[in-house]
């Protein structure tokens, strides 16, 4: 009985249709940001949020523009391990390939892989530890925010 139902569902196209309905029910892929910032205690904190997007035409959604200074490509190898440090500037760090890990006081670890967007705003205080994960290089983009630019939300 069960096999007949599955066979009929495949023949009639119900399963692909169900998958399509589930995809639409979940909505579009959100743009997620992992933000590091300095708390009142001088220690780095983390929060995650989504950038709101608005429809801009057929198949396109855009967020607000963000004023930035420049774009810098970076490669780090598997030996990269930087002890406690604050971010050198308020900047996006976008991982293109490879993986890294950010460690906060208390041992909390945040893993960053391809497609992850980090907004490093912990420019004062103790900062965080950064290290490579895995056996390959990590390629990333550093995108410093313009002076006085608000944090994108």
Predicted region positions:
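A short glycine-rich, His/Asp/Glu-containing loop-to-beta-strand
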Residues: 40-84, 138, 146
